[in-house]
């Protein structure tokens, strides 16, 4: 269960997997969470990922969450014209996700200076991704 990995993380990024466990199932047991520290033991970065499948068997997605103190990412996105659908979705907690779709593939990305929350999958709708990112209840402390 990916939720069992949450205690490994520092809490700089908080997210809730409860809703996912109720509406999706783990499809590939490749979920991981780990922290990287420098040679002096100081925190550098943390990573989490897990893959989920729709309970009806018709779709899947991978959730990846990364926080790295060495990053200086830009939350600005450049969307090229090849997506069938591309728009911003802001969660109730105020985090902005770029949601895109092309064919049977969907993506959702939220980027801050030090953090990336990313989902990609297939055979799901952009509305499905909106529900997922909303119920993740992401909170980022940078």
Regions found by a protein language model. Give the residues of each.
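Short, solvent-exposed recognition patches
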Residues: 1-112
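Surface-exposed amphipathic alpha-helical segments
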Residues: 113-142
